[in-house]
Regions:
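Interfaces and regulatory segments of ATP-dependent nucleotide/adenylate/phosphodiester-chemistry enzymes
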Residues: 1-21, 134-135, 141-147
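Catalytic cores of nucleic-acid endonucleases
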Residues: 55-115
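Active-site-proximal structural scaffolding
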Residues: 4, 8, 32-33, 44, ...
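Polybasic (Lys/Arg-rich)
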Residues: 117-147
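A short acidic/basic microdomain associated with nuclease active sites
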Residues: 16-42
Length: 147
């Protein structure tokens, strides 16, 4: 919880508020509405940045063993898993999809920019973005025209 409070609710939000301070910029968080993503930025009533912040860490054992399968499992569980039952929560890409669908239902012709901000430095490795892009393309395929 400390990671969530500091990274999501303080550090990232402070940065976003300093970057998007024009009078036409609107910033919303989960505190405004539990259905919001971590941060939702509406700019000029047309451009929407849907931001999910992830402060999860890869287990040291996975990194120490250089386990590709363990790393892939971490990526899927942390950034690309759909809730399967009550009490569970969508993760990463599925959270973005939910927000994109909610915005599409409003039917205002938004230009949507989905963003995942992460703190885990091992996600900077080559191939991670390609893996997540492929997952995202598969999950969001029918909604791709929105952004």
């Amino acid at each position: 919880m400390i990671g969530k409070q500091f990274i999501e609710e303080y550090l990232t939000l402070q940065l976003v508020q300093h970057l998007f301070h024009h009078r036409h910029d609107r910033i919303f968080t989960e505190k405004d509405n539990p259905d919001n993503p971590d941060i939702l930025i509406m700019q000029n009533k047309r451009d929407v940045f849907v931001i999910e912040v992830k402060s999860s860490k890869v287990h040291a054992k996975v990194l120490g063993e250089a386990s590709a399968e363990g790393f892939r499992e971490f990526l899927e569980q942390s950034l690309a898993s759909e809730k399967k039952g009550p009490g569970e929560k969508n993760k990463g890409i599925y959270q973005l999809r939910k927000q994109i669908n909610a915005l599409k239902e409003k039917g205002r012709g938004y230009r949507i920019f989905p963003v995942i901000i992460y703190t885990e430095s091992s996600l900077d490795m080559p191939g991670v973005n390609s893996f997540l892009d492929e997952k995202f393309d598969h999950i969001i395929d029918e909604d791709r025209g929105s952004f």
